[in-house]
Structure formats: C-alpha cells, structure tokens
UniProtKB/Swiss-Prot annotation:
Pfam families: Maf. Belongs to the Maf family. YhdE subfamily. This is dTTP/UTP pyrophosphatase. It comes from the Bacteria. It is found in: Cytoplasm. Keywords: Cytoplasm, Hydrolase, Nucleotide metabolism.
C-alpha cells in the first residue's frame, strides 16, 4: 500500500492501524480555484491519489488533503511567522471548520469521502498568539496550527473527529481501507 502524502502526522496515524505501507509524495499542486471547502478537500485528495496511482497501478493508494475554513475564507498553510500570527488571530474566539478529504484507489476502483469537524478556539491575547507563532509549529499545517502539539492549548472545543483535525480522519480511513480489502489492525 502507498500513502500519497509526505505528512508525518498521516504517516504516524496510518502506522498505528497496523497497515504496512510506503510513502510516495504526489507533488500535486494544492492551489485550485474551487472555493467550497468540502469539495476542495475531496478533489485534492483524489488528484493526489490518481497522480501516485499512475506510477503504481497495482498498489492500493490512499491520499488525503485538509482544508480549514473560517466562514467563506480558506486558510491554507501560512507562508511565514507573520501570516501564522494573522491566521491564529482570525481564529481566536471563533469556530471554524476542518475538512479532510480521503481517497483510496485499488484495482481501478476509487472510493472516497470528506470528514468535517468544528473547532472553537478560546479567546487569545496577542502575546499568546505571538508565542505560538514563534514556535513554528503551525507553518506546515492548514489553518496555521497543530492540534496534536502545543496548538491544543488554543482550542476550547472540538465537535467531531479529533483525528480529522490532525489531518487523517481514522473512522473514514478505516471504512475506506476495509472497503478496498485492506486488513486493518491485523484482521
């Protein structure tokens, strides 16, 4: 099986399912005109899976992509500390949505889905935001924060799948893998 993602968080979560795999990064661009976050997450996951499957047609390929939305605004990965600060400032005291699309390709069959989780940040001071931005933790993450690290201190509430906010919704992943005939947890 191939994980079409360079994300260390996705790699760790998939490894915890006891599924042997290797990583092949798709190189697929994440910049698309689609503005609906659920459709965008699903479309990007599918494009990544298809890109890797072209070179590995006999493998089961799984890909994922995460999109963070605050109202109509999509928050990608911040370019630098200043943009990271601005993202967290916008999220402070508000509820946003995290969408992760997952696609599995196996034997010419394609299946996928999108998971949504609502995340509410607590009210934050400018000093707290600056401290978090300086950690650099959010620079490689959609929305500019990592819930599995220090970023958990920013969060007041989660409604939905925690692993979705990490970037790999395990309930959806397990369902899709089993549907493709992949044994999970030594089944």
């Amino acid at each position: 099986m191939i994980l079409a993602s360079g994300s260390p968080r996705r790699r760790d979560l998939l490894a915890n399912l006891g599924v042997p795999f290797r990583v092949v990064v798709s190189g697929e661009a994440e910049d698309r005109p689609e503005r609906d976050p659920a459709r965008l997450a699903g479309e990007l996951a599918t494009l990544k899976a298809r890109a890797v499957a072209q070179s590995h047609p006999d493998a089961v390929v799984i890909a994922a992509d995460t999109v963070v939305a605050l109202g109509e605004e999509l928050l990608g990965k911040p370019a630098d500390e200043a943009e990271n600060w601005a993202f967290v400032r916008r999220l402070a005291g508000r509820t946003h949505q995290v969408y992760t699309g997952v696609t599995v390709l196996s034997g010419g069959q394609e299946s996928g889905g999108v998971e949504r989780t609502d995340v509410t940040f607590r009210a934050l001071t400018d000093g707290e935001i600056a401290h978090y931005a300086r950690t650099g933790e959010g620079l490689d993450k959609a929305g500019g924060y990592g819930i599995q690290g220090v970023g958990m201190a920013l969060v007041a509430r989660i409604d939905g799948d925690y692993s979705n906010v990490v970037g790999f919704p395990l309930t959806l992943v397990i369902r899709l893998l089993r549907g493709a005939g992949v044994a999970v947890w030594g089944e």
